[in-house]
Amino acid sequence: MRARAWWSGQLVADSTAAVRVDLTNEAPVLHFPSADVRFDLLPADGLVRRADGFVAFDHDRVRVEVFDGGDVKRFPTWGDISDLVDLLDVRPDGTARYVSTCRSDWRRPVVEGSQMLGQAIVAASRHASGRRVVSAHMVFPRAADARRPLQFDLDEVSAGRTFTTVGARVRQAGRCCATGTLLLDVTAPDVIRHAVDPPDVPGPDVCDPVDMAVTGRDIRVADGAYTGDPDAPVGPPVLDAWVRFRDLPADPCLHAGLLAQFTGHLSIAAALRPHAGIGQDAAHRTLSTAINAISLSLHAEVRADRWMLYHHQSTYAGDGMTHAECRVHDEAGALLASFTVEAMVRPFPQGAATDGRTSL
């Protein structure tokens, strides 16, 4: 891994042989070979830990960066694209049950609702082999703990010549965390066809890169619309983002699952954009935010390893809730998917911001 470290404005380490070490319930650590560290530029007051020819920096005091394709991302990161694929790649555990692996963010070990939606799409696609998920709706009544695996129980409501309907219930330690319905289709030749045009936004090469702590996932946001700064200029409740997942296996249901996995990331940011004095960084600090439900229609086969344009428009915010109507286009402009997101944006009850329990 190519990485570098900065302290007091000076480059103190630059290496192509840095090694990541994941720790349980703690931030991962990046170890630099000692030969790649400029010890003469560092104070002797505990900025580093040495072990077996390697050096680890205190990430709170030293800025550590990793190179990810053409982007530079701040370390520690959540993981890379292979970790995300492993989460989506649910395993069969009986006739109509699938289970996931787990991977936690040490800062807030809560499973994203859109991750569970993506996993349910993968599970249903494998259950009804040869049919493609065309519609999926899921609600998230209870937060799931990212430190524990998830269980997906499927109920085949009907299976005809063309369509299969599957109910999905996501459980953890016997408690229901999400429930939904998925429709799968063998698909058919066109009788009619039309689709809405994509928004007029710059291409991914000229949009601003955004670091969301996953290497191998490229994100570009148009018009500087994603910011944690509460003093940033206000804008319309619209957010356009190009997304690409690199180095994926060929499995089509994983590509569809990854498209779904990102549907919960930016709709709340779009809702906050018109409101002065409220930045995205307030989420989970002074604002209680969460995705409550997602409805997704998949209009075509998905190639998540190519650029996809996610267009988010928040059409309503009030009574502690937001509603967003969104579309996904490929780089050529074809409509891949449409989705809506229901989310909450509320002040934290007294003391709740410091409550480490995973509850909505």
What would you call each of these model-derived segments?
Residues 73-360:
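Terminal targeting signals and extreme-terminal segments of soluble enzymes
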